[in-house]
A protein has these predicted regions:
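Short linear motifs at secondary-structure transitions and domain/linker junctions
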Residues: 1, 94, 319-322
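N-terminal cationic amphipathic segment used for targeting or macromolecule association
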Residues: 63-64, 365-367
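Long, highly charged alpha-helical interaction/scaffolding segments
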Residues: 36, 42-53, 337, 341-346, ...
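Acidic/His-rich, divalent-metal-binding segments that scaffold phosphate/diphosphate chemistry
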Residues: 3, 8-166, 188-202, 208-209
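Divalent metal-dependent catalytic cores for phosphoryl transfer on phosphate-bearing substrates
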Residues: 85, 109-365
Length: 369
């Protein structure tokens, strides 16, 4: 039985045979007829499926990388697909371009195109998290670039062991880390820092909170007048439903994070050294996303401190409605098929952009300088 959490085959037992599991059975056992499908009465050996590993050279590398990405919960094979160094800003620009092309070709309504493109710009912000950056190590022949905003790197530069160990703290490691969850929580952190009464955050319950006397952080005079980067302004200009859709697409673009935000087995084994609690998919309360540029030519997005409050059920005094409630609202508003369609478009655009070997202009300029 294929174990999606551990990324390996395990002996099949009754408790592991669950709906949706991939089971490997000896072809000599029979039980399958090519004309009728599964047939417990059939004793004829089953024709062998073409061995993917032995025919790797004949298979498109992007398809192979996508399959590997789907086969485990914490792999990043798409990030090594292009064999080139790329920053988050460069990759995000390429994904946004592919999204625009796909959205136009499929005839999406303009407002859906806008939200899909906005999600493309934000989708990989979580790669700035020190756990993801720590997975890029470099080699003696290909040293690591001294940056904290890398999104892509050659295959040989990715750590094969201790995959998500921090660069600046060898004792801190986050097995099972998912960068898209960090991206999602970063969006909530931005609203919380810049506009706590935003309609997508605490706005609908302002009177309730004020009546309860809940202390909420107010913007300083400097923050209130400071002009946000254009990308951040687009996010702040979203209404509640638009923000939730953008956030959902950011979270779901690898199919690993959707409605449920809960700890995995590797999170449960985390050796906590402080009072911040266990991680969820490798992200902990009070983790920081550093200030990075997401759009070439625009000012960087400010540093934020993440909170896991959206994962709790019920109303949060930090982020308002729970993530599960938001997702249920999206399903009621758009329907599951429309959400799946938009998610598929962003994922397709991400895979297309990950194939590109075009040089990153910012790294080319840096190397020239």
């Amino acid at each position: 039985v294929w174990d999606w959490i551990e990324g390996e085959w395990q002996t099949a037992t009754r408790d592991r045979l669950l709906p949706g599991r991939i089971v490997c059975v000896a072809s000599s056992c029979g039980g399958y007829d090519p004309n009728r499908g599964f047939d417990p009465e059939s004793k004829q050996p089953v024709s062998l499926v073409q061995d993917v590993d032995n025919n790797r050279a004949a298979e498109p590398s992007a398809d192979r990388a996508a399959e590997l990405a789907d086969a485990q919960h914490d792999g990043e094979p798409l990030s090594a697909l292009s064999q080139a160094w790329k920053t988050i800003a460069c990759h995000s620009r390429e994904v946004a371009h592919e999204v625009h092309t796909l959205a136009k070709a499929t005839g999406l309504p303009p407002e859906w195109q806008d939200r899909l493109e906005l999600a493309a710009w934000w989708h990989d912000w979580g790669k700035a998290h020190p756990a993801f950056q720590g997975s890029i190590r470099g080699t003696e022949a290909v040293p690591r670039l001294d940056r904290h905003d890398l999104a892509k790197a050659p295959d040989q530069c990715w750590s094969k062991t201790n995959r998500y160990r921090f660069l600046d703290d060898p004792n801190e490691e986050r097995p099972g880390f998912r960068h898209e969850l960090a991206s999602l929580l970063g969006l909530f952190a931005l609203l919380r820092a810049r506009h706590p009464w935003h309609p997508a955050l605490l706005g609908p319950w302002r009177e309730v909170f004020e009546t309860m006397g809940r202390p909420l952080r107010l913007l300083s005079d400097r923050e209130a007048v400071e002009s946000p980067p254009p990308l951040l302004k687009r996010l702040l200009d979203c209404d509640a439903k638009a923000f939730d859709l953008v956030a959902y697409l950011v979270a779901s673009h690898h199919g690993k994070v959707r409605v449920g935000l809960h700890a995995g087995p590797k999170d449960q084994d985390y050796p906590a050294r402080d009072q911040r609690g266990l991680p969820i998919r490798g992200v902990r309360n009070q983790d920081e996303l550093p200030s990075v540029q997401l759009v070439p030519g625009e000012p960087p997005i400010p540093k934020v401190t993440l909170t896991l409050a959206p994962a709790t059920l019920g109303l949060s005094f930090e982020t308002g409605a729970s993530w599960r409630e938001r997702c249920i609202g999206l399903q009621d508003h758009y329907g599951p098929c429309a959400l799946a369609y938009l998610e598929a478009l962003l994922r397709a655009a991400d895979i297309r952009a990950s194939r590109l070997d075009t040089p990153d202009p910012s790294l080319t300029t840096e190397a020239t300088a």
